[in-house]
């Protein structure tokens, strides 16, 4: 930003004086005239004449002609500029010529471009001033700040509308089933694939991060039996999210996105078929090997049924509420019990446990 | 022993010599003239610590973003090549010695923006030819499309923000 300017001034210029003398320097002093005229009056230190070398040019110098013009001694023909034709053909700014109401701005500014003050008919200003009331911010013409910033003059609402109209023929309607029922997405589209495309400046469009593919599968849509599902979940390990019921496969070991996508599909196929296999050791599976603690076959269930039967047989103890202790209420309790045993214990869950137990045994709440 | 005594004597006569501070920080400092003829553009008038606040950058690209630093040194070198070429190719038309040339990168396109002046000579055909040559030359040199979006102003006074 810092600019050095070397301004040299000739303090003892004899040329100017000589010119003044040549034009009409009669009123100068005698001594000055002698010196200016290149006389031999000046002696050097050896006492010899100091002959100053001065060669007057044959043409008249600029200062001389200017002085002659000013004093009216001679008339000079005024010549037009040598680039006059170019200056005449220069167009006035387009923003002054255009009618902003009538013309289409999309045709004037069709694509992203650096701000051009001669084209944009907006009275914009940009830049700071210490005191804006005294002096307005920097004008539009010659404003580098306006040139620097990216503008969105090619993205006016009519331009976007025009673009949308143009690409509409390539679009297909959104599935009406999903519009009416958004929760059916996982049923109709059980597999979703995510990847990122990185756009940045440079001569190379490659970005190594774009190879990563994330595949999410809604496991319930694989139509597996209970045992197969358990096997799939065990094989998938931490890739399976129990809350959402989705399995996530992230592949990034191949170089291209397509390869990674193929690999993800391959992994899914392998998992599916592996889950369907029944091995010999599958029969050895015990109750303790299950992923979840089951109500069926648990000690609680046997003890509970035993208790309920004893209560029925006891003549003095008749269940107060109707239907307590039957199969339906036991199943209901079993569901609650399973949820209670297989999740983190909270105060609410414990209270719910107590409530259900009272209901089952027909005790007054 | 004797030598060490002499040494101590010499030490006792010594003093800490101090000089005035050399204030060498010159960035963004402008020297004013008595008759207010020194032209200042907006870029010059704003201090370096105002970059990003009052004035923006002269180079725009994505290589200085986090996680996108793939070829930052290349970009810096390219910028210098472009700036030097423009300075050398349009010596008659430069504004403030060609210090304020904006280089923007969009996709694989390199855009050179800024201001040029035609106060000395306006030769429209020549300018068109030079623009075409510069674009073509830089495109071949940098192996990517280069666009010149430089605007012309009448003279250097048109870009003057202030005179000091």
UniProtKB/Swiss-Prot annotation, chain B:
<dbReference type="Pfam" id="PF14955">
    <property type="entry name" value="MRP-S24"/>
</dbReference>
<comment type="similarity">
    <text>Belongs to the universal ribosomal protein uS3 family.</text>
</comment>
<dbReference type="GO" id="GO:0003735">
    <property type="term" value="F:structural constituent of ribosome"/>
</dbReference>
<keyword id="KW-0689">Ribosomal protein</keyword>
<keyword id="KW-0809">Transit peptide</keyword>
<dbReference type="GO" id="GO:0032543">
    <property type="term" value="P:mitochondrial translation"/>
</dbReference>
<dbReference type="InterPro" id="IPR026146">
    <property type="entry name" value="Ribosomal_uS3m"/>
</dbReference>
<comment type="subunit">
    <text>Component of the mitochondrial ribosome small subunit (28S) which comprises a 12S rRNA and about 30 distinct proteins.</text>
</comment>
<keyword id="KW-0687">Ribonucleoprotein</keyword>
<keyword id="KW-0496">Mitochondrion</keyword>
<protein>
    <recommendedName>
        <fullName>Small ribosomal subunit protein uS3m</fullName>
    </recommendedName>
</protein>
<feature type="transit peptide" description="Mitochondrion">
    <location>
        <begin position="1"/>
        <end position="23"/>
    </location>
</feature>
<dbReference type="GO" id="GO:0005763">
    <property type="term" value="C:mitochondrial small ribosomal subunit"/>
</dbReference>
């Amino acid at each position: 930003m810092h600019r050095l300017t070397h301004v040299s001034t000739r303090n003892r210029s004899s040329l100017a004086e000589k010119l003044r003398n040549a034009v009409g320097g009669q009123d100068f002093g005698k001594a000055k005239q002698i010196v200016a005229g290149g006389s031999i009056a000046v002696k050097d230190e050896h006492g010899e004449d100091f002959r100053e070398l001065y060669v007057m040019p044959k043409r008249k110098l600029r200062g001389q002609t200017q002085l002659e013009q000013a004093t009216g001694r001679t008339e000079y023909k005024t010549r037009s500029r040598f680039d006059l034709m170019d200056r005449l053909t220069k167009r006035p700014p387009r923003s002054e010529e255009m009618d902003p109401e009538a013309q289409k701005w999309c045709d004037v500014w069709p694509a992203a471009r650096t701000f051009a003050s001669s084209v944009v008919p907006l009275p914009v200003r940009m830049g700071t001033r210490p005191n804006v009331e005294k002096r307005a911010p920097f004008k539009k013409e010659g404003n580098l700040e306006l040139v620097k910033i990216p503008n969105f003059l090619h993205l006016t609402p009519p331009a976007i509308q025009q673009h949308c109209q143009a690409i509409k023929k390539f679009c297909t309607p959104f599935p009406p089933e999903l519009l009416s029922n958004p929760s059916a997405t996982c049923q109709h589209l059980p597999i979703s694939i995510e990847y990122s495309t990185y756009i940045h400046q440079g001569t190379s469009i490659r970005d190594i991060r774009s190879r990563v593919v994330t595949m999410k599968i809604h496991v319930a849509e694989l139509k597996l039996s209970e045992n197969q599902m358990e096997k799939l979940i065990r094989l998938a390990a931490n890739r399976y999210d129990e809350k959402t019921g989705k399995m996530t496969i992230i592949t990034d070991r191949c170089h291209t996105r397509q390869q990674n996508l193929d690999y993800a599909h391959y992994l899914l196929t392998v998992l599916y078929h592996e889950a369907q296999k029944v091995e010999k050791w599958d029969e050895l599976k015990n109750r303790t090997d299950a992923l979840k603690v089951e109500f069926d076959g648990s000690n609680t269930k046997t003890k509970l049924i035993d208790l309920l039967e004893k209560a029925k047989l006891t003549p003095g103890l008749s269940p107060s509420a109707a239907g307590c202790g039957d199969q339906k209420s036991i199943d209901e309790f079993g569901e609650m019990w399973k949820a209670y045993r297989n999740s983190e214990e909270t105060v609410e869950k414990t209270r719910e446990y107590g409530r259900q137990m009272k209901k089952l045994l027909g005790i007054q709440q | 022993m004797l030598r060490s005594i002499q040494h101590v004597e010499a030490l006792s006569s010594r003093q800490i010599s101090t000089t005035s501070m050399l204030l060498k920080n010159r960035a963004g400092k402008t020297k004013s003239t008595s008759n207010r003829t020194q032209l200042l553009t907006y870029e010059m008038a704003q201090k370096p610590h105002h970059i990003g606040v009052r004035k923006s950058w002269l180079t725009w690209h994505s290589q200085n973003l986090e996680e996108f630093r793939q070829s930052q040194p290349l970009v810096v070198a390219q910028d210098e090549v472009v700036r030097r070429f423009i300075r050398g190719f349009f010596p008659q038309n430069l504004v403030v010695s060609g210090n304020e040339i904006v280089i923007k990168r969009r996709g694989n396109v390199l855009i050179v923006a800024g201001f040029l002046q035609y106060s000395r000579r306006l030769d429209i055909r020549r300018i068109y030819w030079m623009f075409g040559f510069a674009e073509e030359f830089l495109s071949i040199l940098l192996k990517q499309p280069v666009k010149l979006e430089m605007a012309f102003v009448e003279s250097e006074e048109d870009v003057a923000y202030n005179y000091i």
